[in-house]
């Protein structure tokens, strides 16, 4: 596959492309590779949002299908109609807490759904099938030592490490990985597998720890922490995993696994403290700005100093609520990602920059996930018994003008300034529920 952007001409199917990672990736590919066609398949479950796809819904090289990967007839229709070259398989249930309560659904969606997709793919001449797995398939990054003190030692997992999943979610992803590998061996399907650290950023559904903490604080509620909060995770900002997929699309070798990781590691408790700090700092800045506008005298400087001193000795306990731990909670996920780095990838967004951008996005978009009725939206067209958004031959000039007018102001694209105020994004309007 040629590295030059203008020669990158492919038809790329992204399953789960209206979700968090998938939507950022779909927007990036649609805008960067104008000669390619980006097709998104998503059933618009609770953690997906058609608005995530923002300004690309009417791009000439984009199309959206609403449907389930468990629907083999739908998959066959899409592959036959679109002549898919590359599949990036992101569709999955991913929330660990839910997997303890609804494990059968995770098996059905993550394993059986992947199997249906593989069965369809084997009948077509794909160039790449990228299965998006998780670092959690490795299990906890601690192994027990055999000395008399029962010490544990840290272990970094590379792509050849044994899979040792410890919860129903990670087990379902590991099981699907084995299916993917079997289709590579048995049917020569050109597969690549990725395993990434935790991803965060704008548009993530607020069941995950970072948006959950942010939204709780924005609503004057406490951060809820499992157990002691000493479990650690490694965090990558969304733009960095998108750039990793760009590299893997162009340079990844068939039959290989690539870890996508970062050396930045932080405990759940310290994540909460960091977000609390940002929240208080932003509030203090707003208050100080108001004070300066109302009273321009030397006392304001003293007040500012007092606020900072109070902040430094702040008691975090009033912002945190400790709850029962998960049935099993991996201590850490430390992965070696040198293999991907050797292809030329490196992260570009620091934790400090990424977490501030993320907080500001949620602060400016507090109602983004509220009152979403995924079954009642406008401008859906029927074609061969399945539904899709995207550019149609009958799009009128007014729609194109609307798209051009709003395209530059889309608040859900990851590559724009996040300090955009309260402007509404361009999207196909959702009908409000009665």
Curated annotation (Swiss-Prot):
GO terms for molecular function: dTDP-glucose 4,6-dehydratase activity. It comes from Dictyostelium discoideum. Substrate binds at residue 134. The active site is at residues 135-136, 169. Residues 286-309 have a biased composition (Low complexity). It catalyses: dTDP-alpha-D-glucose = dTDP-4-dehydro-6-deoxy-alpha-D-glucose + H2O. The keyword NAD applies. Residues 286-310 are annotated as: Disordered. Its EC number is 4.2.1.46. Belongs to the NAD(P)-dependent epimerase/dehydratase family. dTDP-glucose dehydratase subfamily. GO terms for biological process: nucleotide-sugar metabolic process. Pfam families: GDP_Man_Dehyd. It is an enzyme of class 4 (lyase). Its cofactor is NAD(+). It comes from the Eukaryota. The gene is tgds. This is dTDP-D-glucose 4,6-dehydratase. The lineage of its organism: Eukaryota, Amoebozoa, Evosea, Eumycetozoa, Dictyostelia. Keywords: Lyase, NAD.
